[in-house]
A protein has these predicted regions:
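Flexible "cap/lid" loop of the alpha/beta hydrolase fold
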Residues: 109-114, 120-151
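Conserved HGGG/HGGXW glycine-rich cap/lid loop of the alpha/beta-hydrolase fold
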Residues: 15-66
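Short beta-strand/loop motif that positions the catalytic acidic residue
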Residues: 209, 215-217, 221
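Conserved alpha/beta-hydrolase catalytic His-Asp/Glu region
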Residues: 135, 151-208
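Active-site loop/oxyanion-hole signature of alpha/beta-hydrolase fold enzymes
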Residues: 12-13, 20, 58-100
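Gly/Ala-rich beta-loop-alpha elbow adjacent to hydrolase catalytic centers
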Residues: 100, 104, 108
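Conserved alpha/beta-hydrolase "acid-adjacent" motif
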Residues: 222-228
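Alpha/beta-hydrolase fold catalytic core
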Residues: 1-29, 51-54, 85, 92, ...
């Protein structure tokens, strides 16, 4: 699952991050991955989007992928402010569309609420930050989190295979295994998970946004169940698409 796109590195606020930025001088679209993800999480999406004459931007969030994992609290506030700084660094300060999955959706929503950068469209894919703070996760989510305790590549791949609808490629499992071994990676993972669950739920505040919001959720999503889509149903600025499995 190696990215075929040219990657760049930048040092922002003392943290080295990896990112891609292609088709500059066009309408920008930012991809924000979820917990444990990276640029490669979007491999099957970036290609088709690139052909639509859009500027495609994606980054490894601090603490994930091949970006640095300093010893800090990986709060939603930290991430939203950092991503805005990243966009400013690469020259994006105008209307932008954001596509965020899980944790990435929660970060994108925070950016929209704070309005630090003009966001015209926000696509939320099974976003975190919606279930109540009392939500302790599903068996599937807890199974996913067990990758942190995997002692070998084979054990990690078995965990991923048990969560997937089909076979998991060795190349994909290897990326996750190797990156979890990077200094500070597991600590960053745990911090981001805890901070995500502690953050304010964003569904009420996002109603005030002028951005167009699209919510995608899998009917059989076992990580963050479909029932948590309910707050969006009543929002006039939201369109909802339920994906059949």
């Amino acid at each position: 699952m190696k990215s075929s796109l040219d990657v760049n590195y930048a040092r922002i606020n003392g943290i080295n991050i990896r990112y891609i930025d292609q088709n500059q001088n066009r309408e920008p679209v930012l991809f924000i991955h979820g917990l444990g993800g990276s640029i490669e999480s979007w491999n099957y999406n970036i290609g088709p989007m690139s052909s639509r004459n859009l500027r495609i931007v994606a980054l490894d969030l601090p603490g994930f992928g091949l970006s640095d994992s300093p010893k800090i609290n990986y709060s939603i506030n930290f991430y939203s402010e950092y991503v805005v700084k990243f966009l400013q660094t690469i020259g994006i300060d105008r209307n932008i569309s954001i596509i965020g999955s899980s944790l990435g959706g929660q970060i994108g929503a925070e950016m929209v609420i704070k309005n630090n950068v003009p966001v015209t469209k926000l696509v939320l894919i099974s976003p975190a930050g919606v279930p109540p703070r009392s939500f302790k996760g599903t068996p599937t989510l807890r199974r996913y989190l067990s990758i942190l305790q995997a002692k070998s590549f084979e054990e990690l791949k078995n965990i991923l295979t048990s969560l997937a609808d089909g076979p998991v490629k060795d190349s994909y499992a290897k990326i996750i295994f190797e990156r979890l071994l990077r200094p500070g990676a597991k600590e960053a993972f745990v911090s981001a998970l805890k901070e995500s669950s502690r953050a304010l739920r964003f569904t009420k505040n996002i109603r005030k946004s002028s951005a167009k919001i699209f919510v995608l959720w899998g009917r059989e999503d076992k990580m963050i169940p479909l029932k948590f889509i309910r707050p969006f149903v009543r929002q006039s600025n939201c369109r909802i698409l339920i994906i059949e499995h």
